[in-house]
Amino acid sequence: MNTVRVAFLLVFVLAVSLGQADKDENRMEMQEKTEQGKSYLDFAENLLLQKLEEPEAKLLEEDSEESRNSRQKRCIGEGVPCDENDPRCCSGLVCLKPTLHGIWYKSYYCYKK
């Protein structure tokens, strides 16, 4: 009967000690998995961010090409006063000093070439 008790006690002690080791091992394993999961989430987040930045960069590039400053400025029509230093007459027109009409208002007008 004593041998049965000793054997049972020995099995009990081994089970408890190995169980504790397994518990610590499981805890360490879970910590490693969570750290790997965090690094995986960081990697996935960076990958998604890169994928989203590519179309955004293309859209911003298109917007910069079509800015308001790049469009053609409006031109001045025939018989309209113009500035001698900055003539913005339409194509086919020249900024000239008027002959008789308009000499009292402004010194230069857009005329046909």
From Swiss-Prot:
Signal sequence segment: 1-21
Region (Disordered): 58-83
Location(s), subcellular: Secreted
GO cellular component, as recorded: extracellular region
Biased amino acid composition, Basic and acidic residues: 58-69
Tissue: Expressed by the venom gland.
Disulphide linkage map: 75-90, 82-95, 89-110
Molecular function terms, GO-annotated: sodium channel inhibitor activity; toxin activity
Propiece residues: 22-74
Listed InterPro entries: Toxin_22 (IPR012627)
Keyword Signal: yes
Disulfide bond among keywords: yes
Record keywords: Disulfide bond, Ion channel impairing toxin, Knottin, Secreted, Signal, Toxin
Top-level taxon of origin: Eukaryota
Function: Probable ion channel inhibitor.
Sequence similarity: Belongs to the neurotoxin 14 (magi-1) family. 01 (HNTX-16) subfamily.
Comment on protein domains: The presence of a 'disulfide through disulfide knot' structurally defines this protein as a knottin.
Protein name, UniProt field: U11-theraphotoxin-Hhn1a
